[in-house]
Amino acid sequence: MEQKDVSLETQLPIRLDIAMYKKGLYRETDKMSDLICENYPMVLVMSRFGIALGFGEKSIGEVCRQNGVDANTFLTVVNFLTGEVQGLTDEVSNALSLETLIRYLHNAHDYFLAFRLPNMRRKLNEAISTCPEDVAFVIRRFFDEYAEEVNKHMTYEEKVVFPYVRDLLNGKASDKYNISIFRKRHEQIDQKLSDLKN
């Protein structure tokens, strides 16, 4: 069986399709307002890092420091989502704040489960409203099963994976869990998503 890479790319929510926006890496010295003006979907990313609007002309670095967010981690996520970073070097990976990244992923999970999935279901219901009832039922059931799988997966990450990573950060290794177990579970949700798309 082919081993999949469990990297930042596989852990972040779906990349933004923002090819029409500014190209080039964002840096700590760039203004946060420029980031938002040039890539307005980054407002969602900011909120997942716990950064609120109202920063005026401050730089990305200043805003991150004022909000207790590791600027390198914030910029890595931003530059990945804007398509400027395709993968991570060991140097960049080692400089990431895993605690900041976990907090971001936790907030992304909350957003996805509380807002995104219900909104997708509502739009799906609108789209299939003219379908024969038996077809609409099958589509709705498949979506609901998928949503339940996503919910289980994210709950698993919250209750098992994130505490495991935090324990590792605190020097506590586990003999009952490792990242290979996570990888296997993650592949299952990837397959379910692929089934839904097809």
Mark where each language-model region is.
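Small-residue-biased structural context
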Residues: 2-198
